[in-house]
Amino acid sequence: MLLSLAIAGMARELDRDTLLLEDVVVTGTRNSTDIRHLPQTVTVVGRDVLTANEKVNILPTLMEQVPGLMLTSRGVLGYGVSSVCSGGMMLRGISSGSGEVMVLIDGHPQYNGIFGHPIGDSYQTMMAERVEVLRGPASLLYGSNAMGGVVNIVTRRAEQEGHHAYLNLGAGSYGTVQSEAGYTLRSGRFRLLASGQYSRSDNHRPGMGFEQYGGFAKAQYGINSNWNVFADADITHFSASYPGTISAPMLEADQWITRGAVAFGIENNYGTTSGRVSIYDNFGIHKINDGYDALTGTPQSRLFRSKDALMGLSWYQSAMLWSGSRVTVGFDYQNIYGHAYYTSRETGEVLDTPNKQSGEERSHEIAGYVDYRQDVLSMFTIEAGVRYDHHSVAGGEWVPQAGIVVRPLRNGELKLMASKGFRNPTMREMYLYPPSNTDLEPERMWNYEVAWKQRVMSGKLQYGINLFYIDADNIIQTINRQNVNTGELKNKGAEIELQYHIDNHWSISTNHSWLDMCNPVVSAPKYKGYLGATMKHGDWDAVVGITQVCSLYTSIGENPTTEDFTLLNATVSYSLCDKVRLWIKGENLLAQRYEYIAGMPMPKATFMGGINVQF
């Protein structure tokens, strides 16, 4: 309804419309760029939105705010890992669980070196200044695993001069506790930010406990007005238990996971040219008890263990050669390591295992890319780029991309984009377990997209419409007990988003996505919509949001199952003074019965309250 009113009033508003500052993004481009000049579709979720609902993890907020993005969950808190985990992202029907959607931290890849997927419990709100989600392939800049899109976490830094600290505590349903503390220091050219968190929950089913603690730190030093050196580190440890499905309960299915990420680099910015060189490492240590059937099984005599690391070097430089131009060249190197093995529960010794159940491998990727963007007559922007990526086992891959932005109105843009994405086979697919196959080739995908975005009412209301078509082949599937490149994927759909800043007290936002899949996949809905409202009045703040999901596939095969549900969430806070704020929130306030994964029902209404103190 709001979208119809905005379009109907468009002609009346054009003459008196004035553009406000647009979001400046770094995802889809290696330099800070006005989003109006990018042919890619990027959704920006700022820290004010990420923290409004008092969530310790960014993923639930992204599911609400980003059209086409779906997230699986299993309880009040925690996702876990392995085949029984949740926390998987589905973007336009493309799955992060298969390593086809990448998570970045400040542009550095984050995924498991053995299985190729991101780890949902690693992405804590405490580290994020904002999150930029690029819907569609981003392999030109980020290579393998950015086939379906990327979620780039832009980390916080100390902004205010002097010392500052905060403490946020909360507790609620099912023994859930969350806590976070942080400290910032800015003194001259030096900036330091450090934060830590602890959370735990029994969750709503017996045997589904979750506990997590971790920290994030970032230091920066401005050598001069043009050069800056930085270092950051993030580490988290969590333990999670899996109770099985309702019809097939399990015991002792426990996980102990440690994940970390470190980066160090130096960056330059001269206005007409900017760039960065950095080294990074994303690593993990996993210990998993696969558990046993609660009715007929016996305890496991061994534990699965793994160590993995994704180490890399990234360099890029972007320059304006002449008016309206921007060329970016870059080089990437990655060393991908994985070691999977089993140990005895009784003695701890490493076990010899048959059928490729254990293995230790290392692979390398090296890539170079160039991207060129040119503004023409203030009405057009053209962009084209190409990447060559070579994997030590899977071989080389060319990745082209091209797009155009047309601005027929001073407050509106028409975007057309064609981009290729790819994913190299993982260590598991090539070396682990009987279906493994070292002859696998990369998965490949083309995305074709048309988008329109406009701002009206002096920028208070903006909306966007996207139409896309995805054509993927060489998808890795297990056929006759062997992994082979045989699958195809053809998805098409539409997305709509709208934000309306009514006045200083009220604002609303809504987004909707429709997806048509030739081959349905688990956790991908045919429709997802969100409508949210924010109120700020005096010392009171309130956020209310409702999410509608239709035809969500919870299982596929001969007898597929789907879910329809409506989720109502709300958060209210009150400032006792400038330094102290009380908050309370409720989730699934309609007490819906629903599930993301077949046999794993979600909790009904849950509540939590807490306090935030600034020092």
PLM region spans:
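Membrane-embedded beta-barrel scaffold of Gram-negative outer-membrane proteins
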Residues: 190, 276-290, 336, 407, ...
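Short acidic/polar hinge/loop motifs at secondary-structure boundaries
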Residues: 108-135
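Extracytoplasmic beta-strand/coil segments of soluble accessory domains associated
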Residues: 60-108
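Short, acidic, small-residue-rich periplasmic hinge/interaction motif at the N-terminus
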Residues: 12-51, 59, 465-466
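Short strand-turn segments of transmembrane beta-barrel domains in outer membranes
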Residues: 138, 150, 155-185, 196, ...
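Flexible loop and strand-edge segments within Gram-negative outer membrane beta-barrel domains
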Residues: 201-208, 212, 226-310
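Structural signature of Gram-negative outer-membrane beta-barrels, strongest in the C-terminal barrel
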Residues: 224, 319-326, 352-470, 503-505, ...
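Gram-negative outer-membrane beta-barrel transporters
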Residues: 375-382, 467-471, 485-554, 578-581, ...
